[in-house]
Amino acid sequence: MREHRPIIALDFPSFEAVKEFLALFPAEESLYLKVGMELYYAAGPEIVSYLKGLGHSVFLDLKLHDIPNTVKSAMKILSQLGVDMTNVHAAGGVEMMKAAREGLGSQAKLIAVTQLTSTSEAQMQEFQNIQTSLQESVIHYAKKTAEAGLDGVVCSAQEVQVIKQATNPDFICLTPGIRPAGVAVGDQKRVMTPADAYQIGSDYIVVGRPITQAEEPVAAYHAIKDEWTQDWN
């Protein structure tokens, strides 16, 4: 099931900065928000409770990667926060991912990171010593994620079609690195526009700086949302 709201990456250093940003939006507007490591480490679990209390959906992007028992225990705690979605690194292995699923339960979506969108094929081959193509690595991780019983993966939009072919059409593909046409790509190596991401089959898109650093964030958000959903029936 595709998500009609672009997920806004709350890449802010403090609780107060988040409050100031969200104050720009109408109180009745329900958003889908990503809390990453920077914000979670700065504000703690209370940031999730605060966002849920405002009626927003929360993707807690912590990319857990540890031994299975530790990840399972951590996921039990995250499940109590009421997050709507969270993630692990697929590189942690099938047993770790199964443990994460068991710890989190079935109320929240659980997805895995394949290769970060900041990773190029040359970087992967040199630093991870994975001597395949980037796409082959991503497909391998996606298959293992499906095998472990997770809901989907984080991946580049360019990889969505091959991942769904290798797994199943309902396997979630969440796509970061989304940039409207004409916006600087920043540190992302593999990017795509919202309209292109829709056409290629992404289920969720994540957008950060083009919204949070825009002169008019609310207008930027709705422009991206309109582009993302313009061809929906």
Swiss-Prot record:
Cross-referenced Pfam families: OMPdecase
Pathway note: Pyrimidine metabolism; UMP biosynthesis via de novo pathway; UMP from orotate: step 2/2
Annotated GO MF terms: orotidine-5'-phosphate decarboxylase activity
Disulfide bonds: none
A GO CC annotation given for this chain: cytosol
Enzyme Commission code: 4.1.1.23
Catalytic activity annotation: orotidine 5'-phosphate + H(+) = UMP + CO2
Domain of life the protein comes from: Bacteria
SMART domains in UniProt: OMPdecase
Biological process (GO), any one: 'de novo' pyrimidine nucleobase biosynthetic process
Chain positions recorded as substrate binding sites: 11, 34, 61-70, 117, 179, 188, 208-209
CDD domains registered for this protein in UniProt: OMP_decarboxylase_like
Active site: 63 (proton donor)
Protein keywords: Decarboxylase, Lyase, Pyrimidine biosynthesis
Function noted in UniProt: Catalyzes the decarboxylation of orotidine 5'-monophosphate (OMP) to uridine 5'-monophosphate (UMP).
Complex and partners: Homodimer.
Family: Belongs to the OMP decarboxylase family. Type 1 subfamily.
Name of the featured protein: Orotidine 5'-phosphate decarboxylase
Taxonomic path: Bacteria, Bacillati, Bacillota, Bacilli, Lactobacillales
